[in-house]
Amino acid sequence: MIETTKDMISVWMGTSFKTPDEFNEYTDGMEDSDSHCPAFADFGVSFIDSDYFVAFQTDNGEIVPVEVLAEEVGAHSNKVIKDIVKVAKEKGINEGNSLYYYSNATFYEENPGKLYNDLKFIG
């Protein structure tokens, strides 16, 4: 479930071997509550606001250190980026090529360890 929370950011990271089109299918239709967007069921919502939700993949799916990948999160704080890297490493993510982040949102993970379009929820 996702709850609007000012000044919070929820992050998912990992490695995906999907093509960009396959990767993007997961969030296709996210701003249309009548769509069958696959992310809706995983996130427990019927709408995802693209003003706050970002999907990112590295060029050509290049796998990079988690420290490099985390720089793509729009956290606007070096401390937050360092915290994301720390938690990612605690969850076994040392490198990757893809991430999602949702600004002003708190995600409550009902099934810890679940993959969301190949990505792990970081926090």
Explain the meaning of each model-derived region.
Residues 1-27:
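Short, extreme N-terminal segment that most often corresponds to the first beta-strand
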Residues 32-123:
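Low-complexity intrinsically disordered segments
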